């Protein structure tokens, strides 16, 4: 049975490295699957949380740009607080049990040159750790901070994660892509809502 939720037209392709269908998440996207689809993304200062219920073999990934926003600044999906709620709520709606959910978190590199005081990558990493601790969701693996962008593949049915640290040559490309998304989202209207589960 395959009941993948497709959010914002997540691109799917055949991944030749792992010989499976993969879904490539861009900033602000998330996806929950219960099949052999690999969830993949490329991260600079952004963070991806990979959540899984190991009993149901259901899991998902999100990709957020900033920890939290200010009231009324638009495009809430770019913020970790919103992205985490969307991912957790979707898993719960599909039968995941909150007490079984476990997390693996990645990204938060400090790739934006010149931002040495309270860099966004460090803030994103601190946010995801604190958020998951507050939600009582254990982090069973992490690769956060540092200076290198990463490509992440997550296989929700098995829980396997592969992380490839990208060479410095990719830093400018990843940082430019993240900055472009931030600029586009700052002009986007606020849409949708989120239902919070206690």
Curated annotation (Swiss-Prot):
EC annotation from Swiss-Prot or TrEMBL: 3.5.1.44
Physiological role: Probably deamidates glutamine residues to glutamate on methyl-accepting chemotaxis receptors (MCPs), playing an important role in chemotaxis.
Signal peptide start-end: none
Name the UniProt record assigns to this protein: Probable chemoreceptor glutamine deamidase CheD
Gene3D superfamilies per the UniProt record, alphabetical: 3.30.1330.200
Gene name tied to this protein: cheD
CDD domains assigned to the protein according to its UniProt record, in alphabetical order: CheD
NCBIfam families (UniProt xref): PRK13487.1
SUPFAM superfamilies hit by this protein: CNF1/YfiH-like putative cysteine hydrolases
Catalytic activity as recorded in UniProt: L-glutaminyl-[protein] + H2O = L-glutamyl-[protein] + NH4(+)
Gene Ontology biological-process annotations: chemotaxis
Keywords attached to this entry: Chemotaxis, Hydrolase
Family: Belongs to the CheD family.
GO molecular function: protein-glutamine glutaminase activity
